[in-house]
């Protein structure tokens, strides 16, 4: 049987809720990162892992993170692309619906690694019930001290928000997504400049897919080298697949 990473605990009753998620080892990676690692060390682990974008392009995630511009006095942002609009695709919805705290944990790690105090999950408008699940999970995480000011006494501040789209397919493209997130019509921007230099509100921004962000959690927990041992060739780690149609057992 193939090894599971992201869905390893999906079968546990109540894993959607903070108390159960925490009991099963949730947020352990954030503790490790804030207490024993530097932001640069996290980026290096992601590079060593060989993790590639899980949204379709397959660009090396660590390399993408290293491209983020860091001008003095200018805020930076992490945006999670949860605008899952391809027909028959629902793996990201599955993660958010059943293990929302895994995505939140990954967003905290990415935000710390990239020096971002405010981050966003841009979700497909049709996923209205998933938005409610995420917002409840964010409230739970904040009440437990994983979001907000001075997390774990580290001096790191992080706020996380969920923003629904309006159902436009084009907003799955990262620059159209950013336009929509800014409250504008979701038209793609001309590139360059790329979001890493001029993204959300003209500031340096990293846009990653739900599955990509979630994969950062096992990478920080176990190390990039361990993650890189899984997979084939340059395709390291695990990959979620949406199985649907005329099947006996559709699912992820």
Regions found by a protein language model. Name each.
Residues 10-11, 34-51, 154-164, 240-247:
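Short, hydrophobic/aliphatic alpha-helical segments
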Residues 1-48, 116-121:
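Iron-sulfur (Fe-S) cluster-binding modules
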Residues 21-27, 80-92, 195-200, 241-248:
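Gly-rich Lys/Arg/Thr-decorated short loops/hinges at beta-loop-alpha junctions or inter-strand turns
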Residues 79-99, 114-117, 122, 131-132:
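A structural-propensity feature for long, helix-poor, extended segments
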Residues 99-113:
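Histidine-anchored nucleotide/phosphate-binding helix
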């Amino acid at each position: 049987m193939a090894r599971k990473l992201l869905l390893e605990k999906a079968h546990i009753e109540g894993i959607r809720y903070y108390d159960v998620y925490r009991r099963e080892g949730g947020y352990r990676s954030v503790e490790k990162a804030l207490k024993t690692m530097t932001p640069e060390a996290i980026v290096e682990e992601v590079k060593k892992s060989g993790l590639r974008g899980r949204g379709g392009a397959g660009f090396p995630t660590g390399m993408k993170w290293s491209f983020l511009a860091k001008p003095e006095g200018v805020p930076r942002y992490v945006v999670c692309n949860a605008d899952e609009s391809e027909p028959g695709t629902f793996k990201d919805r599955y993660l958010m619906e059943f293990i929302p705290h895994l995505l939140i944990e990954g967003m905290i790690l990415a935000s710390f690694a990239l020096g971002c105090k405010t981050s966003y999950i841009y979700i497909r408008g049709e996923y209205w019930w998933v938005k409610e699940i995420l917002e409840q999970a964010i409230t739970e995480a904040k009440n437990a001290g994983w979001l907000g000011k001075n997390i774990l006494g580290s001096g790191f501040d992080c706020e996380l928000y969920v923003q629904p789209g309006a159902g436009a397919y084009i907003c799955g493209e990262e620059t159209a997504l950013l336009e929509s997130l800014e409250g504008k019509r979701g038209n793609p921007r001309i590139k360059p400049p790329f979001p890493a230099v001029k993204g959300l509100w003209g500031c340096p921004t990293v846009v990653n897919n739900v599955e990509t962000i979630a994969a950062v959690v096992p990478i920080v927990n176990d190390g990039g080298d361990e993650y890189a041992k899984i997979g084939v060739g340059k395709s390291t780690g695990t990959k979620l697949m949406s199985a649907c149609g005329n099947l006996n057992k559709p699912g992820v």
